[in-house]
Regions:
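Actinobacteria-biased recognition of intrinsically disordered, low-complexity terminal regions
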Residues: 1-21
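Helix-rich "cap/lid" substructures immediately adjacent to catalytic or cofactor-binding pockets
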Residues: 14-109, 171-172
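Alpha/beta catalytic cores of group-transfer enzymes, especially the acyltransferase/condensing modules
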Residues: 32-34, 60-62, 72, 121-173
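Basic, gly/Ser/Thr/Pro-rich low-complexity segments located predominantly at protein N termini
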Residues: 36-38, 66, 115, 119, ...
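Residues within well-formed alpha-helices
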Residues: 55, 89-92, 116, 129, ...
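Gly/Ala-rich beta-loop-alpha elbow adjacent to hydrolase catalytic centers
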Residues: 90, 106-114, 118, 126
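Alpha-helix C-terminal capping segments
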Residues: 96, 100, 119-125
Length: 173
């Protein structure tokens, strides 16, 4: 999760009538692709972080400690691993920075799978529910992608007519 300092951009969260000074604490959880081999290694020396990551691993029934510290790139790119790993990393790093950080945040958001971490942080559902949800979501998406090469496809940019022609040529809808 990325903590984005303060902002002077006018928004509802910085409205003085709502008790805000004008500074806004926004926490944004990343989506799949933010993970790198060993990206959690340095965090493991922090007891708050390592305890939370171990607990989240147990809840998800996935060894997220190993995946965040020693698993190779191919392993952590697997959607079934990457998604629970990213949600757990977002929650554990934020709690390590400040155990009360989510209650202090003015804005919580997430990109793609990061929305699950943001939802748990906002109290929309429990942390345990978030970890079970993201585990099942990751497994389902990995299974769908393994059945058909184009079952999990995204188009980023390009000329609209060319993109539509390519989609049609591939037999996709």
């Amino acid at each position: 999760m990325t903590t984005v300092g303060t902002s002077s951009v006018p928004c509802l969260a910085s409205d003085p009538s709502r008790g805000h000074s004008g500074d806004v604490l926004a926490i944004v959880a990343p989506g799949q692709g933010a993970q790198k081999p060993g990206f959690l290694s340095d965090w493991m020396s922090d007891a708050t972080f390592s305890d939370h990551l171990a607990w989240l691993s147990a809840v998800a029934d996935i060894d997220l400690v190993t995946h965040g510290t020693t698993s190779d790139e191919a392993t952590i790119k697997d959607t079934a691993v990457a998604q629970p790993l990213l949600v757990a990393a977002a929650l554990a790093t934020a709690w390590s920075v400040d155990p009360e950080i989510f209650s202090q945040a003015d804005l919580l958001a997430g990109h793609s799978v990061g929305e699950i971490a943001a939802g748990a942080a906002a109290g929309a559902f429990s942390t345990e529910a978030a970890m079970v949800l993201v585990r099942e979501r990751g497994r389902a998406m990995a299974e769908a992608a393994s059945r058909t090469a184009t079952s999990m496809t995204a188009v980023i940019g390009g000329d609209a007519d060319e993109v539509l022609t390519a989609i049609k040529a591939a037999g996709l809808t």
